């Protein structure tokens, strides 16, 4: 360390300013001591200087000037700037070294810096929004207080006018003659006075409340700002709160969707119940229709056997009549036709037979008459069969046997006739 030398020098103000302007920047003291043999004061050293003052003065003023170059605050600024430059150079070298060595760390650092910048931008925006909200709230409170003050200022004037009016009314009431004649009026005035006193108390209470409102605004504002700053210092907590709020909103939306689905399911259940009722009604109707069809079939079956029984009896009677040789030739053809109709009703005579049955069903009276006629014919045929049969001569019997086949051979021409009838129906 170099030794400090203080020399008292008295200079005029003009010379002191020239010295300050012309002094070169500071240099390391060790180099100066080596190069210059003459000892000089070190940099940034205070030197007392006596400056002349106009006019007679008992006490001489002493001024302290810096001998070499630069004042203290400028030296400190220069030293700080040099230190910052060295730090920046050192940081730049470290960054270059890191870039050359670890590109992954560089990317991570850049991402971290971007995230920090984004968070800082978000925090600044939130601060602006909060400041705007605070300004709006303060403006609203100021408006409310202004309106209350106006009301309070207007209200005392009205009260003062009422008090004066009451005082004027009380003066004539002091007379004993008037007091004795106006008791009700006095009671009314006393009530008004009590009401005015209550209003005064309310005014005082309102004034106290205004004072309390004005103070908390000033007290609570810094607390509120501190809370906001703390919140801004912890963005992670804010992000967690935001995530929680988003999750709660999603849960609410999910619950609303579930409620809508439940309502839709309830509607579908009602529709299903209605459909089940309709299906039950349809099944009941189908059962009724099946019962009706079954009844119709039974009716048809009941009507057909009567005709078939009558026809079978008629055929038996005709076969018996065929035993008579005189009637066999004319009745064989008739029997063949009837047997063909009875054996093949589905292929040959179904449409006509059905039409006849429908007509008969439409006219039951005619059917009964026909049945009665058939019964009469059958009775006549039975009577004919009961009559004795005369045996023919031997020559005639041979002729008859040659002309007419036996009972077993009667079916052959009937089958041929059935085949002929089928061919005729197909051609038609």
Swiss-Prot record:
Basic and acidic residues: which segments have biased composition? 56-76, 107-117, 162-174, 192-208, 220-297, 313-327, 352-366, 374-385
Region: Disordered; residue ranges are: 1-128, 140-398
Q: Which GO terms describe its biological process?
A: keratinization; keratinocyte differentiation; peptide cross-linking; response to UV-B
InterPro entries xref list: Involucrin_CS (IPR019743), Involucrin_N (IPR019571), Involucrin_rpt (IPR000354)
What subcellular compartments does it reside in?
Answer: Cytoplasm
Tissues where this protein is expressed? Keratinocytes of epidermis and other stratified squamous epithelia.
Q: Does the keyword Acetylation apply?
A: no
Entry PTM: Substrate of transglutaminase. Specific glutamines or lysines are cross-linked to keratins, desmoplakin and to inter involucrin molecules.
GO CC terms of this entry: cornified envelope; cytoplasm
Q: Keywords in alphabetical order, please.
A: Cytoplasm, Keratinization, Repeat
The annotated regions of Low complexity compositional bias extend over 77-92, 209-218, 298-311
Tell me the function of this protein. Part of the insoluble cornified cell envelope (CE) of stratified squamous epithelia.
Annotated family = Belongs to the involucrin family.
How is the quaternary structure described? Directly or indirectly cross-linked to cornifelin (CNFN).
- The entry's protein name is Involucrin
Q: Which organism is it from?
A: Cebus albifrons
């Amino acid at each position: 360390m170099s030794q400090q030398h203080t020399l008292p020098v008295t200079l005029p103000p003009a010379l002191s300013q020239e010295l300050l302007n012309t002094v070169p920047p500071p240099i390391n003291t060790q180099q100066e001591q080596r190069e210059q043999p003459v000892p000089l004061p070190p940099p940034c050293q205070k030197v007392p200087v006596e400056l002349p003052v106009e006019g007679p003065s008992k006490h001489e003023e002493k001024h302290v000037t810096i001998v070499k170059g630069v004042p203290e605050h400028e030296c400190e600024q220069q030293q700080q700037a040099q230190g910052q430059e060295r730090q920046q150079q050192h940081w730049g070298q470290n960054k270059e070294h890191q870039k050359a060595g670890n590109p992954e760390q560089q990317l991570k650092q850049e991402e971290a810096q971007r995230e920090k910048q984004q968070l800082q931008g978000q925090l600044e925006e939130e601060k602006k929004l909060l400041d705007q909200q605070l300004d709006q709230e303060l403006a609203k409170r100021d408006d409310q207080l202004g309106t209350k003050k106006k009301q309070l200022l207007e209200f005392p004037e009205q009260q003062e006018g009422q008090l004066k009016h009451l005082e004027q009314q009380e003066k004539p009431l002091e007379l004993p003659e008037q007091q004795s004649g106006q008791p009700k009026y006095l009671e009314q005035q006393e009530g008004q006075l009590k009401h005015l006193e209550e209003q005064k108390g309310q005014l005082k209470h309102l004034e106290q409340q205004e004072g309390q409102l004005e103070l908390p605004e000033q007290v609570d504002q810094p607390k509120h700002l501190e809370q906001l700053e703390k919140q801004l210092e912890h963005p992670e907590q804010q992000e967690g709160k935001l995530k929680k709020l988003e999750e709660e909103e999603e849960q609410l939306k999910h619950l609303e969707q579930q409620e809508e689905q439940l309502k839709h399911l309830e509607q579908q259940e009602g529709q299903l119940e209605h459909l089940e009722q309709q299906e039950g009604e349809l099944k009941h109707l189908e059962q009724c229709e099946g019962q009706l069809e079954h009844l119709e079939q039974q009716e048809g079956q009941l009507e057909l056997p009567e005709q078939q029984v009558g026809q079978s009896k008629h055929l038996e009677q005709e076969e018996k009549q065929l035993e008579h040789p005189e009637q066999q030739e004319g009745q064989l053809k008739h029997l063949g036709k009837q047997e063909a109709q009875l054996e093949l009703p589905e292929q040959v005579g179904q449409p006509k037979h059905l039409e006849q049955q429908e007509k008969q069903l439409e006219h039951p009276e005619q059917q009964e008459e026909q049945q009665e006629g058939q019964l009469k014919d059958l009775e006549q045929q039975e009577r004919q069969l009961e009559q004795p049969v005369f045996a023919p001569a031997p020559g005639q019997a041979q002729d008859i046997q040659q002309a007419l086949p036996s009972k077993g051979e009667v079916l052959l021409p009937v089958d041929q006739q059935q085949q002929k009838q089928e061919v005729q129906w197909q051609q038609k």
